[in-house]
């Protein structure tokens, strides 16, 4: 059997663990020299591939240099927000597959979130339509943890660890004065509140801050919010509140839109930011207390200092498992995680039909949110805590800073 080449790409927002999945794919592929010749990377995803920007991993990261991917945040290959046309009759598809043929590609891997799985779905369906034998698989990635048919996704654990740690640090900072104050922390999450829920992991004891946590899975009422903040002063004169960027009222209007309209991205998703600042001003004007807001922003997804060992190892495992599955002939699938136990925590990799995953969204179960919508339950804590475990020792360079790997 003649050898073929494998190509991998990254797409969407980066995470602290997306390069671990890339490492898993590349390192496993390099072991199978009897079947796989070259291992290529698409620079800036499908968009870059269409423009002819490709690298050869054996040349770009030879030998032990490849390992540095496992502690490097961001997306080593670069990313894109390119949306493939809905119609498989569009000329971009034969163009892509002609390029695959020219490069002798036998296996295609795309590492990303929901929109990336949409790409995997379209490419695998087109391959089936034309009778191509290219095996096309998706590697999950998203800090939002909103991919369906998987217990969780690589990237979420590290982002959740960052959120919990940062909320604990902000709480310590907020509580230095014996004077009423409210600190509102705005956390990523448009429709799914997994990351914001992780703020509950910051608590050291019952009644500790954050005293209020609001997710987008439930309706947000401004007046009820003000009442709860006022009541929270009975527990602590310094109240920390965590809110998802996508909290909305009963009519579906985002709270951030109370001040201004939100724009949209290439996939039609609203770009949200600003609910924390709105609530800060509201608390200050209505309750007459010191108030401030903190937007965690992109730091949630790029902190190598908070890279969770569990997250890193599962990212690598997913990459390795995917290559093994592809070599066994699997295609049109996404690598998924199936939890086997909470304590001690254990999981295994499985394969799921990517067509049942793309364009769907997994939200926090309503039964994991308190009835009044201002906190998460113990079930959420039990689910999330194992995912933030483990410390990764990131090598330090001569300049005293993390020794990340950079694409040249």
Locations of the language-model features?
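Glycine-rich beta-alpha junction loops
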Residues: 44-47, 141-145, 187-192, 216-222, ...
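Gly-rich Lys/Arg/Thr-decorated short loops/hinges at beta-loop-alpha junctions or inter-strand turns
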Residues: 2-9, 69-82, 141-151, 178-181, ...
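N-terminal phosphate-binding or glycine-rich loops at protein starts, especially the Walker A/P-loop
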Residues: 1-54
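Glycine-rich oxoanion-binding loops at beta->alpha junctions
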Residues: 52-106, 115, 156, 168
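Short glycine-rich or small-residue beta-strand-to-loop segments that form or flank ligand, phosphate
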Residues: 5-15, 75-81, 106-112, 138, ...
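C-terminal non-catalytic interaction/assembly regions of soluble proteins
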Residues: 257-408
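Accessory alpha-helical/coil subdomains and C-terminal extensions
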Residues: 99, 107-112, 118-133, 153-292
């Amino acid at each position: 059997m003649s050898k073929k080449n494998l190509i991998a790409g990254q797409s969407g927002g980066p995470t602290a663990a997306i390069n671990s999945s890339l490492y898993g794919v590349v390192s496993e592929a390099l072991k199978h020299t009897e079947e796989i010749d070259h291992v290529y990377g698409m620079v800036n995803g499908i968009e870059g591939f269409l423009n002819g920007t490709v690298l050869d991993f054996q040349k770009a990261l030879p030998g032990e240099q490849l390992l540095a991917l496992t502690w490097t945040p961001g997306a080593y290959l670069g990313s894109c927000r390119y949306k493939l046309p809905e119609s498989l009759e569009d000329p971009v598809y034969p163009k892509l597959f002609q390029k695959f043929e020219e490069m002798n590609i036998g296996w295609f891997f795309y590492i990303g979130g929901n929109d990336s799985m949409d790409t995997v779905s379209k490419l695998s369906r087109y391959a089936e339509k034309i009778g191509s034998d290219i095996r096309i698989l998706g590697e999950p990635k998203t800090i939002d943890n909103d991919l369906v048919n998987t217990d969780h996704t690589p990237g979420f654990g590290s982002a959740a660890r960052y959120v919990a740690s940062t909320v604990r640090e902000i709480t310590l900072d907020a509580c230095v004065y014996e004077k009423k104050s409210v600190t509102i922390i705005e956390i990523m999450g448009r429709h799914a509140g997994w990351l914001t829920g992780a703020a509950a992991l910051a608590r050291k004891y019952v009644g500790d801050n954050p005293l209020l946590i609001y997710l987008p899975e439930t309706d947000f009422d401004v007046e009820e919010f003000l009442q709860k903040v006022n009541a929270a002063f009975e527990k602590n004169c310094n109240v920390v509140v965590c809110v998802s960027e996508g909290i909305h009222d009963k009519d579906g209007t985002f709270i951030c839109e109370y001040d201004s309209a939100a724009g949209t991205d290439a996939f039609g998703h609203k770009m949200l930011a600003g609910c924390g600042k709105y609530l800060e001003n509201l608390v200050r004007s209505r309750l007459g207390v010191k108030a401030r807001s903190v937007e965690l922003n992109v730091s949630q997804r790029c902190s190598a200092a908070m890279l969770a060992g569990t997250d890193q190892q599962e990212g690598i495992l997913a990459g390795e498992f995917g290559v093994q599955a592809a070599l066994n002939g699997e295609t049109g699938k996404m690598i998924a995680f199936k939890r086997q136990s909470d304590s001690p925590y254990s999981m295994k990799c499985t394969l799921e039909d990517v067509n049942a995953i793309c364009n769907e969204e997994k939200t926090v179960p309503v039964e994991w949110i308190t009835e009044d919508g201002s906190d998460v339950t113990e079930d959420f804590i039990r689910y999330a805590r194992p995912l933030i475990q483990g410390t990764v020792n990131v090598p330090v360079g001569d300049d005293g800073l993390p020794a990340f790997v950079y694409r040249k």
